[in-house]
Amino acid sequence: MAMKIRLARGGSKKRPFYRIVAADSRMPRDGRFIEKLGTYNPLLPKDSEDRVKMDLERVQYWLGEGAKPTDRVARMLEAAEVLPKTERNNPKKAVPGKKAQDRAEEKAAKAAEASEAPADEAPAEEAAAE
């Protein structure tokens, strides 16, 4: 049986509330689960202690049994220092787009030309007469 530790949505429309549950991966998101492991209330402020509550002993038990946490639950477990932090990398986000790269190259070329030209054509400044 493939086990998952995931969020099951509760609450009403526009007022989400989630249970952190251990469930068979084939069951529906809000359907039957094996054990409730905690709660997550996204409406509370991020620094609130009540935002995420988990029974860490039971979470570690289910991880030992082979349950795989979903991405969101894995981040919560990393914050609780149950799982080691995984390095996330998005290198393409830092690279500017093609047009921006072209503009930067043109600007660099103009700056190079401008720095060469004024050295030759710069007129000598005359001393101000008093």
Curated annotation (Swiss-Prot):
Signal peptide: none annotated. Coiled coil: none annotated. Pfam families: Ribosomal_S16 (PF00886). Keywords: Ribonucleoprotein, Ribosomal protein. Gene3D superfamilies: 3.30.1320.10. GO terms for molecular function: structural constituent of ribosome. The keyword tRNA processing does not apply. It comes from the Bacteria. Residues 82-130 are annotated as: Disordered. One of its GO terms (biological process) is translation. GO terms for cellular component: cytoplasm; small ribosomal subunit. Residues 99-110 have a biased composition (Basic and acidic residues). Residues 118-130 have a biased composition (Acidic residues). The keyword Ribonucleoprotein applies. Belongs to the bacterial ribosomal protein bS16 family. NCBIfam families: S16. PANTHER family: 30S RIBOSOMAL PROTEIN S16 (PTHR12919), SMALL RIBOSOMAL SUBUNIT PROTEIN BS16M (PTHR12919:SF20). This is Small ribosomal subunit protein bS16. It comes from Dinoroseobacter shibae (strain DSM 16493 / NCIMB 14021 / DFL 12).
